[in-house]
């Protein structure tokens, strides 16, 4: 029973309604014949048949009765519908009275008659259920049908009482009046059947079907234009549950119905005969089914072979019949013909199709001219009829069939809203009634769908009219519905939008979760429409806020979908508008309460809240950090779960975790508001025991309640560690592992307080993080992917740079190095090594080198008692270079040592394998005392032998027993190791050997250079200057002092004889300068012979001048005695100086009578010089004296006396040529530089080193001196041994839209945070005097400014191109911006400082710059910064690097450090991408290859004789060294050996062409306000001195040898300082 309907039983004209008392068969024949005739009139025109209003009135009354026929007569009803359709839309068939219908009477009657088809019907009970296939084809819906005589008892599970069913059916089939007899004769439409499967009776109330109506419509319409509402009764089953929305029937169904017409009853009779033959079988089957089936509902079906078919309309669940049997014809018809068996479902589908045909006519009328030509009264009357129809079909208390309602609902509602909006009614009564009755329709899903579509159609022009200028000048606005458009005035649009929006009432009152979710979805679309044109979040919340807040705050079981949508809407509103408006406090309070409630839920509510609130802490929303405790609970629930299949949820959770990491360091003791005092955070699952390693490394347990920010620190640590152990997505792991670095950087700050127990914040965390990474990376089960392991190794390499602030660094470093060594040793055992494995081993070797090089920790601590780490390093690197692990051959080495000791022979194991089968072959490696054997490798495990060892390899044990001799095998080489791995291992070993604890080096060198800048030309100039100073020789041939050699193919050495020092020209002070060029750079070393300990030379000690070699011929014998010339020289020296000082020995003597001569070998050179003394001769010469006395010759005596007197006088005059100290003087020092060959000390040095021995002849190769060779050396010096990176820094103000706007910014117009950031990037150096890497900055004209930030470590150099520090005027080109663009756009990675939101930059400015990777920095409040790495689409999937992999919020004090690391790693990823196969070479490898090319191209092959003569002969004039810095390279020059290094490539030294597998650690990053480096000069902030822009050399204490630094003209400045 429909209550409060808008229908009324009208009083009809007395002259009408005569057909109401006719039998059904008569009415059927009359309607059929009349309508069929009018559809196809003889003359083809209806206007000549229906000429008067009376005729039209009579025909319409007949047609009205056609609409009231039973549904079984659907073909006749369809013809009636087609007749009205022709009259309405076909002018040719439109009757004349209908054309002249000025008062629209007949049009109203047509609309009313069409509504009769929607009258609830009772469907007959003769249903064929015997066909099982029909049951399968049906929609398996159970239909409970009641008849018109209140057969409720039969519906209440009276399924087993067939007698009662039959009685009820008989009573139902009873008809009143004259129809009783006819109904008893016509058994076909009143078949009584008891369905065994349904258990309920189905009957047709003939009185209700055939006689009931003398009304103009099923609503009862009279002639009045505005009938009052009155309820109408109808008897059908009420709808019990909502169904899936359906789509309207297409116009093609009409053709299907018409095609099924037949000519007479012949077909009917044939069908009846076939059915009668099967009737008995069907009845038996029905009885069996009744016993088997216990369901109280009816399963509908069709008769086997029937013409009725079921089809599913596209996009709809509605089942419609494809054809209807033509039961009647114009030639033969009998009311006694038995109708075929028809299922209820087919009848309902037929009814649905008829109703849909009517609704299509209504739509066509509303979209055509009728809606514009009808009067307001007619339109409102039409609206009332549509409202009544809709409520009758869809209302809560409706008696219409549920399936019929489900089939008609979508098209019915669409028609209602279109007709209603086309009418443009302002009648408040109608609108109020629509609002009232619509509340009873929302239990149908299509109702919500149609409401959503209508609201969205009205909202689109509404927001454009209010917030844009599109409709400002228009008086009307076009509303675009599904298939039509309507012109509205603005005022009516606003009125209709508000009315339609509030039809739904409060969506939270909807009882169905699915419909509630659909309603919230519609609200979401409306809110999104508003947000697309306005940022006024308060206005949007005024409209929708109450609905959404209630939906989210009231958590109802089963409504998760709608609640999650409500949470998404709130987050969408607040996060998108937070930076543009201030929300009202009441809205903020409600928002935080709702989101907090959602975060304490599980399932879809929590998932959607996390996903859509990932940017909540970077949005600038006031007070958003009050939600942190709730987010911690949610992150605990998500990140600690094992094996989740929702990587997107975990990605957003990890992003939120990154937004919280920095906050405890900023707000330590600030308290939180507790939304839910009774709720506590669930305890974290325990971490694996193998990552803790002792109680002292256990993390502090997080508290159950979070009261302050300090309480967050252990929670964050546990979340990171737990997520590392549970995360399965590689993409998420690439972001998560870098949180270890952020946590370490944030909490290693000096102002961070330790825990109450005294432990540092990061001590336990960093230890367990390292253990977790190493456990996952070295796992044999491949728990992490290849990309994740590579990124993890990069992280470990970068952590080494923080060694000074990592707690327990020695322990952590030992753990990292030991486990990586085991990892490398294990991976090198693979027989078929994949490229991924090669990358892992290479990066592992480089990571080991980084941890070893940063400090001498490997030699500290317990090194004296535990050397396992030390040996493991070289074991792993040797295995990576192709050697065999000593652990694998220790047994064979032990047996070899024992056998060798028995024969008196021992050898150092060269890695040979006892089981290799090659041990019987002798090695060709030569040996010699003092020789250099670069190819031999000694095994540390064989060092236990106490006997002298010789170069060789361990061989088979049987060799020692064969004749007492031992044959050395060939060295073991692992052929499975790729050349790439070997090269990287060699480079790592070279870095350890040459760079350990060597940056910055201890010789007052600056971070600018790690290689010497001294060249051969500088030293030649120094020698010439000293020769002119000491000897007065101009143009001293110092070029003869140079010789170039190659040691193997990896080292180029230059030996230079230095005959003079800066203060002396004594031969004893001469020395040799060695310039060594290898893969690690260039080193300059001075070597000097020393026979006594060096002492600090005083300034007053002046060397004795070199004596002319021709005037000082001194015998070098042991008993030498000075000659006269020598005595004169010595005498002159004594008379002038009284003391003679030599370079190495000071010889003193005292005067006596006699000087006994003593051999030199009797004296110790360390003792004081010997002292001679005169001793009296007491020998007896008596006989000779007496003889002389007897034979005295006076003359002779006189002569003797005179001679003696003269001598006496002479001696007296010369003081007898005697002094108190008389000694034998040593040989006078000689010089060997007077000849043409100046190579003297260098030859001695090479001899002592064993290079000139015949055994080592092939180790040292002289190189040809030529201009091309000297130019190649200059090119080699220009190849840096460190990675060189150019980093552009671009400042973008809010509002900048073009490149010119951006590049016009200068430092003075920037913010203080930006200036602090620039200051913290590196050291500010002057461009004109800087000696380090500058990229393409102009040093000559200073086009790019005078200063630039520079930063360097032991493995890389960085120069920053700061756009705001560059002038805006280019003098050379007279261009204001072009010089900046050319410089900055050359790089692939840039850093963008944007004073706005990242989302705005990504939408508007990302494509402004050509860089493939852009790291964007946006400042937040309280010294916090939001960072995000934006990648161009062409590279986004292959360039995920850290630390800023996706998005993070960090503090100010770590900003510069994070940016440097991110740029370095991003450059490395681009290098890997540009190399094609993803394999880039180590930076050392480029130098090594170039050295090999130079050696092969310029080696000088000599015979043995020529080789030795080469060291004594002077060079030809063409072979003398030339300074070729300014000479162009010959275009036709090519290396003999093919090389991958392009000698003529100008930009070869840039970072884009030099890759590295390592990410070496920089020194401690500068603070926010960096202090000047101690090496900076006061003039420009550079390490350059005021004289020449170089570093002043100093000699370390305790050394006399001068380690030449990087400055030319070194000794000249020293000489000037002594003047």
Curated annotation (Swiss-Prot):
Protein name from the UniProt record: Rap-GAP domain-containing protein DDB_G0281809
Annotated keywords: Coiled coil, GTPase activation
GO CC list: cytoplasm; macropinocytic cup; plasma membrane; protein-containing complex
Ranges annotated as biased composition (Pro residues): 1559-1573
Keyword Cell cycle set for record: no
GO molecular function, one term: GTPase activator activity
Coiled-coil region(s): 265-295
SUPFAM superfamilies documented for this protein: Rap/Ran-GAP
Residue ranges annotated for the Rap-GAP domain, each copy included: 1273-1494
Record region (Disordered): 128-249, 289-316, 907-974, 1134-1153, 1554-1619
Low complexity composition-biased segments: 130-204, 231-249, 916-926, 934-965, 1574-1590
Segments of skewed composition (Polar residues): 1591-1619
GO process annotations (BP): regulation of macropinocytosis; regulation of small GTPase mediated signal transduction; small GTPase-mediated signal transduction
Naturally occurring in which organism (per UniProt): Dictyostelium discoideum (Social amoeba)
Cited Pfam families: RALGAPB_N, Rap_GAP
InterPro entries given in the database record: RALGAPB, Rap/Ran-GAP_sf, Rap/Ran_GAP_dom, RGPA/RALGAPB_N
């Amino acid at each position: 029973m429909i209550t409060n309907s808008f229908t009324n039983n009208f009083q009809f004209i007395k002259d009408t309604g005569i057909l109401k008392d006719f039998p059904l068969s008569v009415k059927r024949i009359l309607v059929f014949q009349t309508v069929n005739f009018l559809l196809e009139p003889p003359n083809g025109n209806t206007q000549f048949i229906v000429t008067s209003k009376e005729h039209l009135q009579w025909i319409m009354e007949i047609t009205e009765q056609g609409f009231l026929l039973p549904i079984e007569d659907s073909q006749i009803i369809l013809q009636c519908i087609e007749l009205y359709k022709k009259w309405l839309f076909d002018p040719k068939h439109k009757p004349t009275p209908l054309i002249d219908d000025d008062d629209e009477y007949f049009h109203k009657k047509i609309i009313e008659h069409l509504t009769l088809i929607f009258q609830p019907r009772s469907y007959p009970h003769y249903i064929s259920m015997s066909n099982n296939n029909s049951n399968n084809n049906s929609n398996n819906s159970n239909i409970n049908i009641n008849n018109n005589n209140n057969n409720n008892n039969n519906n209440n599970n009276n399924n087993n009482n067939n007698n009662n069913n039959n009685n009820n059916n008989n009573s139902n089939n009873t008809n009143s009046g004259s129809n009783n007899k006819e109904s008893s004769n016509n058994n076909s439409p009143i078949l009584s059947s008891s369905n065994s499967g349904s258990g309920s009776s189905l009957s047709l109330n003939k009185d209700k079907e055939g006689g009931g109506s003398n009304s103009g419509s099923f609503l009862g319409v009279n002639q009045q234009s505005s009938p009052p509402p009155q309820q109408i009764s109808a008897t059908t089953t009420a709808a019990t549950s909502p169904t899936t929305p359906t789509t309207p029937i297409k116009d093609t169904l009409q053709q299907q119905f018409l095609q099924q017409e037949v000519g007479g009853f012949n077909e009917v009779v044939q069908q009846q005969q076939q059915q009668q033959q099967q009737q008995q079988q069907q009845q038996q089957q029905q009885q069996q089914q009744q016993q088997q089936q216990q369901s109280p509902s009816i399963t509908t079906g069709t008769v086997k072979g029937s013409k009725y078919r079921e089809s599913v309309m596209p996009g709809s669940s509605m089942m419609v019949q494809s054809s209807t049997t033509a039961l009647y014809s114009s030639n033969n018809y009998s009311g006694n013909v038995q109708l075929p068996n028809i299922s209820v479902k087919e009848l309902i589908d037929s009814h649905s199709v008829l109703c849909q045909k009517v609704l299509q006519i209504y739509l066509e009328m509303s979209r055509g001219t009728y809606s514009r030509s009808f009067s307001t009264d007619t339109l409102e009357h039409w609206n009332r009829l549509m409202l009544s129809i809709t409520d009758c079909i869809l209302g809560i208390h409706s008696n219409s069939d549920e399936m019929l309602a489900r089939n008609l609902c979508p098209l019915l509602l669409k028609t209602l809203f279109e007709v209603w909006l086309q009418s443009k009614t302002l009648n408040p009564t109608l609108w109020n009634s629509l609002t009232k009755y619509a509340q009873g329709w929302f239990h149908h899903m299509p109702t919500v769908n149609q409401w959503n579509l209508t609201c969205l159609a009205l909202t689109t022009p509404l927001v454009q009219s209010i917030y844009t200028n599109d409709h400002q000048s228009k008086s009307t606005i076009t509303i675009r519905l599904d298939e039509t458009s309507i012109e509205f005035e603005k005022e009516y649009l606003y009125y209709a939008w508000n009315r339609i929006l509030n039809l739904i009432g409060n969506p939270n009152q909807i009882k169905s979760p699915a419909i509630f979710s659909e309603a919230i979805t519609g609200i979401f679309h409306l809110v999104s429409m508003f947000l697309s044109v306005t940022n006024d979040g308060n206005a949007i919340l005024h409209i929708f806020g109450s609905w959404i807040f209630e939906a989210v705050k009231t958590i109802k079981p089963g409504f998760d979908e709608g609640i999650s949508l409500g949470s998404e809407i709130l987050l969408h509103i607040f996060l998108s508008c937070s930076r543009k408006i201030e929300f009202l406090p009441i809205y903020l309070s409600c928002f935080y309460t709702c989101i907090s409630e959602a975060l304490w839920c599980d399932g879809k509510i929590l998932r959607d809240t996390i996903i859509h609130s990932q940017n909540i802490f970077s949005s600038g929303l006031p007070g958003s950090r009050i939600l942190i405790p709730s987010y911690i609970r949610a992150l605990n629930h998500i990140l600690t779960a094992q094996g989740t299949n929702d990587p997107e949820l975990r990605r957003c959770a990890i992003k939120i975790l990154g937004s919280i990491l920095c906050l405890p360091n900023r707000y330590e003791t600030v308290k939180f508001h507790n939304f839910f005092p009774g709720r506590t955070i669930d305890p974290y699952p325990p971490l694996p025991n193998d990552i803790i390693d002792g109680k002292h490394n256990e993390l502090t347990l997080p508290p159950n309640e979070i009261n302050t920010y300090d309480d967050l620190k252990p929670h964050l640590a546990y979340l990171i560690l737990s997520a590392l152990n549970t995360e399965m997505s590689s993409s998420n792991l690439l972001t998560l592992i870098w949180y270890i670095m952020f946590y370490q950087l944030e909490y290693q700050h000096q102002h961070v307080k330790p825990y109450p127990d005294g432990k540092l914040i990061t001590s336990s965390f960093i230890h367990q993080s390292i253990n977790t990474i190493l456990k996952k990376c070295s796992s044999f089960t491949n728990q992490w992917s290849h990309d994740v392991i590579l990124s993890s190794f990069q992280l470990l390499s970068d952590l080494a740079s923080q060694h000074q602030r990592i707690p327990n660094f020695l322990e952590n470093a030992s753990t990292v190095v030991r486990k990586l060594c085991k990892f490398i040793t294990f991976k090198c055992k693979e027989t078929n090594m994949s490229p991924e494995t090669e990358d892992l081993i290479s990066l592992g070797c480089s990571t080991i080198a980084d941890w070893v090089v940063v400090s001498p920790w490997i030699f500290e601590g317990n090194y004296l008692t535990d050397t396992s780490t030390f040996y493991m390093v070289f074991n792993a690197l040797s295995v990576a270079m192709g050697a065999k692990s000593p652990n694998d051959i220790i047994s064979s080495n032990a047996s070899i040592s024992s056998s060798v000791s028995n024969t008196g022979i021992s050898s150092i194991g060269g890695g040979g394998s006892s089981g290799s089968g090659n041990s019987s072959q002798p090695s060709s490696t030569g040996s010699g005392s003092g020789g250099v054997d670069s190819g031999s490798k000694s095994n540390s495990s064989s060092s236990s032998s106490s006997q002298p060892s010789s170069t060789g390899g361990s061989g088979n044990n049987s060799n020692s027993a064969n004749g007492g001799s031992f044959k050395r095998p060939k060295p073991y080489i692992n052929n499975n190791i790729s050349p790439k791995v070997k090269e990287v291992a060699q480079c790592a070993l070279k870095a350890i050997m040459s760079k350990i604890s060597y940056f910055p080096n201890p010789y007052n060198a600056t971070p600018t250079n790690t290689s010497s800048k001294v060249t051969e030309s500088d030293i030649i100039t120094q020698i010439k200057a000293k020769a002119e100073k000491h000897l007065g020789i101009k143009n001293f041939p110092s070029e003869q002092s140079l010789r170039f050699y190659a040691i193997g193919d990896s080292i180029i050495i230059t030996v230079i004889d230095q005959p003079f020092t800066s203060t002396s020209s004594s031969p004893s002070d001469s020395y040799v300068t060695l310039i060594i060029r290898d893969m690690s750079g260039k080193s300059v070393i001075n070597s000097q012979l020393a026979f006594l300990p060096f002492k600090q030379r005083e300034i007053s000690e002046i060397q004795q001048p070199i004596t002319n070699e021709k005037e000082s011929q001194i015998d070098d014998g042991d008993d030498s005695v000075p000659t006269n010339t020598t005595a004169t020289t010595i005498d002159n020296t004594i008379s002038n100086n009284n003391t003679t000082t030599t370079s190495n020995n000071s010889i003193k003597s005292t005067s006596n009578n006699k000087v006994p001569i003593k051999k030199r070998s009797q004296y110790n050179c360390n003792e004081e010089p010997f002292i001679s003394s005169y001793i009296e001769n007491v020998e007896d010469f008596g006989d000779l004296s007496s003889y002389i006395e007897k034979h005295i010759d006076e003359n002779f005596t006189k002569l003797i006396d005179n001679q003696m007197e003269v001598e006496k006088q002479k001696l007296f005059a010369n003081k007898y040529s005697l002094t108190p100290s008389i000694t034998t003087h040593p040989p006078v020092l000689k010089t060997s530089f007077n000849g043409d060959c100046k190579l003297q000390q260098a030859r001695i040095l090479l001899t002592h080193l064993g290079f000139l021995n015949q055994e080592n002849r092939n180790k040292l190769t002289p190189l040809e001196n030529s201009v091309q060779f000297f130019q190649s050396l200059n090119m080699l010096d220009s190849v840096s041994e460190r990675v060189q990176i150019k980093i552009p820094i671009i400042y973008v103000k809010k509002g900048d839209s073009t490149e010119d706007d951006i590049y016009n910014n200068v430092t003075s117009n920037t913010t203080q945070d930006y200036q602090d950031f620039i200051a913290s990037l590196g050291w500010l150096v002057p461009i004109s005097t800087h000696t380090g890497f500058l990229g393409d900055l102009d040093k000559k004209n200073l086009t790019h400014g005078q200063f630039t930030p520079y930063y360097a470590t032991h493995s890389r150099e960085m120069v920053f191109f700061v756009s705001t520090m560059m002038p805006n005027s280019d003098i050379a080109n007279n261009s204001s911006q072009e010089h900046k663009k050319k410089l900055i756009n050359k790089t692939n990675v840039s850093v963008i400082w944007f004073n706005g939101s990242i989302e705005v930059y990504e939408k508007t400015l990302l494509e402004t710059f050509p860089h493939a990777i852009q790291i964007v920095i946006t400042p937040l409040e309280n010294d916090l910064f939001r960072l995000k790495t934006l990648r161009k689409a062409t590279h986004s999937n292959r360039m995920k690097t850290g630390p800023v992999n996706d998005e993070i919020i960090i503090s100010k004090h770590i900003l510069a450090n994070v940016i440097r690391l991110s740029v370095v790693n991003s450059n490395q990823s681009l290098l890997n991408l540009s190399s094609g196969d993803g394999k880039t070479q180590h930076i050392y490898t480029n130098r090594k290859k170039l050295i090999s090319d130079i050696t092969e191209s310029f080696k000088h092959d000599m015979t043995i004789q020529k080789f030795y003569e080469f060291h004594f002969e002077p060079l030809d004039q063409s072979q003398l060294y030339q300074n070729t810095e300014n000479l162009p390279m010959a275009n036709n020059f090519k290396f003999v050996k093919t090389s991958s290094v392009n000698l003529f490539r100008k930009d070869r030294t840039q970072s884009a062409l030099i890759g590295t597998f390592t990410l070496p650690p920089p020194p401690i990053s500068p603070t926010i306000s960096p202090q000047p480096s101690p090496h900076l000069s006061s003039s420009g902030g550079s390490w350059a001195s005021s004289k020449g822009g170089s570093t002043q050399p100093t000699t370390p204490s305790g050394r006399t040898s001068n380690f030449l630094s990087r400055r030319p003209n070194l000794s000249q400045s020293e000489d000037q300082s002594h003047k």
